[in-house]
């Protein structure tokens, strides 16, 4: 006999991790009806690209009709850039904002963020603190 225990009743969350070029709004729209309580993630968004976002850019991050838990993942190596990106996206209703500190993606290749942050805990902490302070 098979026993099914809902993850939520165990205090467990099911996350769909960020996948570059995949976890965009279209995939999230497909996944949400399949598992409404799943915590979905955006692709890694470069903080520098969110310095002066247009309304169209912001809508692509979280369309007005998108519901359910959603995490915005930011990639960046500068505290000022990350803080600015957090402020720019503050009104979009993300449940969490995550600092990418482990991505091996070629998108971060040679950059001072992503997996390279694993080598410098003090710097990673200062970036996370800048993001938290910007969020208020």
Each model region followed by its residue ranges:
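Glycine-rich, positively charged N-terminal anion/phosphate-binding segment
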Residues: 2-5, 10, 19-91
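General secondary-structure edge motif
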Residues: 10-11, 69, 104, 111
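Conserved Rossmann-like nucleotide-binding pocket used by diverse enzymes
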Residues: 15
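Short glycine/proline-enriched coil/turn segments at helix->beta-strand junctions
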Residues: 36, 93, 133-136
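Glycine-rich, proline-tolerant flexible connector loops at the mouths of alpha/beta enzymes
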Residues: 44-51, 101-122
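Alpha-helix-loop-beta-strand connector modules within alpha/beta enzyme cores
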Residues: 61-69, 116-136
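Short glycine- and Lys/Arg-enriched binding-loop motifs that mark or flank ligand-binding interfaces
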Residues: 72, 98, 110
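Short coil-to-beta-strand
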Residues: 92-102
